């Protein structure tokens, strides 16, 4: 049986590598380096969930979240970001995020969040 697809959108290579180490055994990982790339990839893949950073070049992650929720409202999007404010978390949830995980994160946080939205 093929692995479920996860789309990971983060501009930091080190973070993408961390996700790869944590998730590659269980998921078919697709990576986007910015929001424009993520939106383009979503035209051709159907991920089970998405991990999305907020602070990125070209298009802010919150804008990407809004666009994704307009075109694919059922796609679970987990925000993983360096922003640790309650206000930012509330805005993300209000805009359709399934979960909000501040960086730095632990492996178990990521695995638990993905498991919760992909049941």
Can you name each region flagged by the protein language model?
Residues 56:
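Receiver (REC) domain active-site loop signature in two-component systems and cognate sites
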Residues 87, 105-115:
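C-terminal output helix
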Residues 13-30:
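Two-component/phosphorelay signaling modules centered on CheY-like receiver
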């Amino acid at each position: 049986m093929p692995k479920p697809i996860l789309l990971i959108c983060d501009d930091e290579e080190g973070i993408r590598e961390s996700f790869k180490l944590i998730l590659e055994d269980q998921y078919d990982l697709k990576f986007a380096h910015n929001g424009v790339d993520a939106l383009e990839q979503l035209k051709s893949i159907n991920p089970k969930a998405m991990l999305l950073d907020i602070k990125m070049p070209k298009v802010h992650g919150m804008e990407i979240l809004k666009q994704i929720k307009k075109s694919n409202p059922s796609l679970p999007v987990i925000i993983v970001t360096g922003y640790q404010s309650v206000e930012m978390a509330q805005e993300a949830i209000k805009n359709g995020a399934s979960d909000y995980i501040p960086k730095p994160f632990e492996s178990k946080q990521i695995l638990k969040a993905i498991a919760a939205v992909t049941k």
